[in-house]
Amino acid sequence: MKKFTTFLLGFMFAVTLAQAPANYYDGTAGLTGATLKTKLSQIITAGAIDKGYDGLYTGYPTTDRDHYYENDGSVLDMYSENPTGTDPYNFQHGVKKCGNYSNEGDCYNREHIVPQSFFNSASPMVSDIHFIRPTDGKVNGIRNNYPHSVVATATQTTLNGSELGESTTTGYTGPVFEPIDEFKGDIARM
């Protein structure tokens, strides 16, 4: 009985919190089909705000702050984070942003998980924070526009163990970039 009561209270609490903001769906009552779809599209679109490419850096302290591994508030960089030990280097938000680098740890920039060349650097994708992560500039350059996949033999290995090399994927023989196992799922979902 105690488990059931706990479950019921938890369920009721979750349902209460999962409500849309007041008046969010105004104008949808009685609509169906294409008319409803169009109205929902208008509602969703009205809530999206493109902060621009430089605006990504203002979002990263919220979206990519390390609250899990070292829990130190540094930039959570999937290409330099070492989940099982000491990071080779850390970046602080707003410090050491870059365009120029020669070594890992010099600076961090913005990594398009889906390369800009796939969508001709068009808006709004070019500044979509949902798939642009802050990463080490040097490793971002190593990754280049190569797809993410499993590496057969590494030609280059980064300080956290990510690799560049030939693909094991049937039908693709070019170079690929393989992040460490800890972040493969995150990257696959972007």
Regions from the PLM with identified roles:
Residues M1-P21:
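Bacterial Sec-dependent N-terminal signal peptides
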Residues F4, T16, L76, Y108, ...:
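A broad, low-specificity signal marking well-ordered, structured residues that form hydrophobic/aromatic
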Residues A18-P88:
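N-terminal module-boundary/linker segments of secreted carbohydrate-active enzymes
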Residues L56-D64, Q92-G94, S117-S121, P175-E178:
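Short alpha-helical segments and helix-capping/turn motifs at coil-helix boundaries
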Residues P83-C107:
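Short, His- and charge-rich active-site/binding loops that engage polyanionic ligands
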Residues C98-M190:
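Domain-level detector of nuclease and nuclease-like folds
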